[in-house]
Amino acid sequence: MNIRVFLTGAFLCAFTAARAAGVKICFEAETAEKIEAPVVLVTNGIEGASGAYLEIPEGAGNPPKVTDGKAVFSFEVPDEGVFTLWCRVWWDGECGNSFTARMDDLPAFLFGEDATYKAWHWVKYPLARTAAPLRLAKGRHSLVFLNREDGVRLDQVLLSADRRFVPVDIEVPGLRK
């Protein structure tokens, strides 16, 4: 009986992962449906994948002094699955290298805190097996980036159901299967 339950559970997990396998959803940060200060849209035509990005400027403030600030995104998932969240970011320094993020109504989580500064680069969540993966059902979802530290920039957001995929450069926005 226990073996049957285990095998059934393993089959369902594999089936769910297989349904979304290879799906990649990429969007530009400036497509946020809502931006609340101190998050600002920067359109300088130089940096960022499309010449624009979101930023919490250095010195703009962060919690607990400044509790406002967010960027809200909505996107469609074509098939249920387990996804890795990748963001193309630019960090000012060790005190400006993370966001708080929230997917749908799930608990908020820390995004970032790597040690690559003053360069555009990709960062992923979850980093380790200790963090819960992002299990997303087919349909509409909401992703919110909240003010945690100033001196941060966000250029692109990418969700991938392929655990082996690692973005290297600017990604083409849209859905790929």
What are these regions (language model features)?
Residues 1-7:
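Bacterial N-terminal signal peptides that target proteins for export
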Residues 10-19:
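Hydrophobic h-region of N-terminal signal peptides that target proteins for export
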Residues 20-177:
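Extracytoplasmic
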